[in-house]
Amino acid sequence: MAPWSREAVLSLYRALLRQGRQLRYTDRDFYFASIRREFRKNQKLEDAEARERQLEKGLVFLNGKLGRII
């Protein structure tokens, strides 16, 4: 599992936003709103395991292992 850190979270956030700029057949506004909503929802997590789980979920989504929204 990826170690949680502020830098890792920000890096994931930026990578997801960059990926969103390349979307063709999907509503970009919906994609960006979904990314922002998920990050804000998990912003106040205090449990280290929960943070790492959410970071891992984001990395899996970024790498397309769950299917991309394209």
Swiss-Prot record:
Pfam families: Complex1_LYR. A motif (LYR motif) lies at residues 12-14. GO terms for biological process: mitochondrial fission; mitochondrial large ribosomal subunit assembly; mitochondrial respiratory chain complex I assembly; positive regulation of mitochondrial translation. Keywords: Mitochondrion, Ribosome biogenesis, Translation regulation. The keyword rRNA processing does not apply. GO terms for cellular component: mitochondrial matrix; mitochondrion. The LYR motif mediates interaction with NDUFAB1 and is required for the function in mitochondrial fission. Belongs to the complex I LYR family. Interacts with intermediates of the mitochondrial ribosome large subunit (mt-LSU) (via MALSU1 as part of a complex that also contains NDUFAB1); regulates mitochondrial ribosomes assembly. Interacts with MRPL4. Interacts with MRPS27. This is Mitochondrial ribosome and complex I assembly factor AltMIEF1. It comes from Homo sapiens (Human). The gene is MIEF1.
